[in-house]
Amino acid sequence: SGRTGIVLTTPEFLSIHRDRFARSGRIGFVVIDEAHHAGLAKGGDRSAYLDMPDILKALGDPVVMAATATATAPVVAELARMLPITRTVVDETVRENLQLEDDRDLASRENRLVSIVATGEKTVIYVNSRDQSVALAKTLRKRVPDCATHIAFYNAGLARSDRRRVEEAFRDGSLSCIVSTSAFGEGVNLPDIRHVVLYHMPFGGIEFNQMSGRAGRDGQPAVIHLLYSSRDARINERLLDCYAPERDELVTLYRALQTMWRSNRGKTGDDSFSASDIDIAQMCLAIDARTPVDERSVESGLGIFEELGFCRVSGFDDTRRIAMAENPGRVQLSRSIRYLEGLRSRMEFSAFRSWALDSCASDMLAKVNRPIVPRA
């Protein structure tokens, strides 16, 4: 009807409802913020971005602008191919208001964290899992009782309305400390963050810059605190292993899926079965008690198998159904983009790990102060 001029949406919503948007005939300009996600989508991160070429064609090929402060040359090349984009504008502004306090491998990082939170200044603490965000927020409320009502956790598992309430409370000063996964701060204008704490090690250079760069966006002095350790690196490596399980793990997972599929078909006659990631991981352990397969490996493995044509997955969570291919034949793992991207992520983290643990503080601050941009 023309009553709405601007629509804010996610790539997933746009992908699902592309035909409805196309029927309006009114989409002339598409802006993709935090566009590095689109450039990294081949690894299974926000895979709806991979639909962008078809979406834009359905919308009548509108003008497209992509914006990000963290885009390497390969990411820019992928964005240009996907969207497509013919012109790149680079702003190499250098920030001068940030300090970096290096407390890597500190004996008691929790004590150091308590002293930061006790200042009452706006603080964002980044951890690597939803469970950790909840647990650390609970710990800080106990250890800094004067600030207990001003501390909250934030992660993608919260309802959108709850996330919005946390953001607004932090913005208006009702909250002074947020313990979060990388979900907090992206796409939200929060200029007056005085402390950013990397409690756990980020997964790569882009994430390091994204998190650290959220400090002091108002131009006033702000501090980045490095509290991660070499122990965190080992945890990250295990998490990344889940995204690209080893061949032996995938063999065990495939045997488990086949066992559950055949058992269910024998009992019910149904060609598909329903099982949680935990159920499947337990079946893997029953087959091989030494397997490292867990629920995270199951999720990644299912994605790889579906890509290779070994299975078909429909629905989500409790409604998910899995159907195995009768005779899929032999297929090389290298034909799975998801598997290859998982291997690439592991290799990239290996290089980042050395930099994140061994670089001097001045070099690390210089990396934050300069945006990640494509270099000639």
Feature names for model-found ranges:
Residues 3-6, 26-29, 60-65, 122, ...:
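Loop/turn-to-beta-strand initiation segments
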Residues 120-138, 147-182, 188-376:
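C-terminal helicase lobe
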Residues 10, 68-70:
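Conserved phosphate-coupling serine/threonine residues in phosphotransfer and NTP-handling enzymes
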Residues 12-13, 19-63:
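SF2 helicase catalytic motif II
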Residues 58, 70-118:
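Interdomain hinge/linker at the junction between the two RecA-like core domains of SF2 helicases
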Residues 1-16:
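Inter-Walker segment of RecA-like/P-loop motor cores
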Residues 14-15, 37-46, 73-74, 187, ...:
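Catalytic P-loop NTPase motifs of RecA-like helicase/translocase cores
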